[in-house]
Amino acid sequence: MARVKRGVTTHARHKKILKLAKGYRGRAKSCYRIALQRVEKALQYAYRDRRTRKRDFRSLWIIRINAAAREHGLTYGRFMHGLTLAGIDLNRKILAEMAVNYKDDFAKLVETVSGKLAENS
C-alpha cells in the first residue's frame, strides 16, 4: 500500500484556521496553536450570542414600549393587557418601532387601549 503524506491537508487546515484568525492581536493571528484556541473560543461566543441577541432585542423592545406607554399614562403590563382585550395583534418589535418612529399612531393605539381598559373595569 502506498504511503500517504498529509502535508497538503494539514497545510489547508492550518490555513483555514489562520484565515479565521485574521485581525486578532499578537501571536493569535500567526501561530496555529494559539489561533486554533482563539478561533474555537470565538465560535463558542458567536453560538452563545446568537441566542442572547434574541433576548436582548426583546428586552429592548419592552423597554421602549414601556417608556412610550408611560408617556401616555399606562404601564407596559396594562398596555399589553389592553391590546389583548382590544383584539389588536401586534408583536413587540412592531410596537417598539411605532413607539420610536410613529408616535402619533402609537398615541392612537394607546387611546384605543385605554378605552377598552375603561370598558372592562
From Swiss-Prot:
The keyword rRNA-binding is annotated on this UniProt entry: yes
GO cellular component terms attached to this protein's record: ribonucleoprotein complex; ribosome
Entry's Gene Ontology BP terms: ribosomal large subunit assembly; translation
Keyword set, alphabetical order: Ribonucleoprotein, Ribosomal protein, RNA-binding, rRNA-binding
A single MF term (Gene Ontology): structural constituent of ribosome
Top-level lineage group: Bacteria
CDD domains registered for this protein in UniProt: Ribosomal_L20
InterPro entries for the chain: Ribosomal_bL20, RIBOSOMAL_L20_CS, Ribosomal_protein_bL20_C
SUPFAM superfamilies to which the protein is assigned, alphabetical: Ribosomal protein L20 (SSF74731)
Keyword presence, Nucleotidyltransferase: no
Purpose: Binds directly to 23S ribosomal RNA and is necessary for the in vitro assembly process of the 50S ribosomal subunit. It is not involved in the protein synthesizing functions of that subunit.
Family: Belongs to the bacterial ribosomal protein bL20 family.
Annotated protein name in UniProt: Large ribosomal subunit protein bL20
Organism listed in the record: Wolbachia sp. subsp. Drosophila simulans (strain wRi)
Record lineage: Bacteria, Pseudomonadati, Pseudomonadota, Alphaproteobacteria, Rickettsiales
